[in-house]
């Protein structure tokens, strides 16, 4: 990565940002399947032309002309598989459900199941999670569970006034 940055001529570039491939790790294992690689992320940008996007889910850089570099950033996403399943407990699905509710998104009784199943199939089959063995299966199951929980919570906000009243929608993050 350092060598890729050194080779850039930042004073004469038409690009306002540069994206690196994120090499996501679980423990010491590189996860190449389930859409986790190459997972491009902008980490070098001209602050006069690009800026943080106004998105509540994740911090991201809004750039009009980013360039993808042939270099990796190693990202230790989770120390072990257990942390991958602790993620729903950190309430990312609840935050996503709040954002969807604020945007007027609706769910029905089948939404949690269908969205959860769709997320699992997308990760495991279409993004080749089956090629990653246990890690690929685990990532796909985690994606399905997160999607299921997100829509189940959205449905709960729609159906249960006490739950809705107890939530602070001004504080999503």
Identify the meaning behind each predicted range:
Residues 1-160, 168-172:
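Catalytic-site signature of metal-activated, phosphate-bearing donor transferases
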């Amino acid at each position: 990565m350092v060598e890729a940055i050194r080779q850039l001529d930042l004073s004469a570039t038409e690009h306002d940002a540069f994206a690196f491939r994120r090499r996501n790790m679980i423990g010491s294992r590189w996860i190449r399947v389930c859409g986790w690689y190459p997972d491009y992320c902008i980490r070098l940008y001209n602050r006069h032309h690009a800026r943080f996007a106004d998105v509540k889910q994740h911090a991201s850089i809004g750039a009009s002309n980013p360039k993808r570099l042939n270099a990796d950033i190693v990202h230790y996403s989770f120390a072990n598989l257990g942390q991958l399943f602790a993620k729903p407990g950190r309430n990312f699905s609840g935050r996503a459900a709040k954002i969807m509710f604020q945007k007027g998104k609706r769910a029905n009784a089948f939404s949690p199941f269908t969205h959860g199943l769709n997320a699992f199939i997308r990760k495991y089959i279409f993004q080749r999670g089956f090629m990653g063995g246990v890690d690929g299966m685990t990532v796909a199951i985690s994606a399905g569970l997160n999607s299921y929980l997100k829509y189940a919570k959205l449905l709960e906000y729609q159906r249960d006034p006490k739950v809705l009243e107890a939530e602070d929608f001004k504080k999503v993050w």
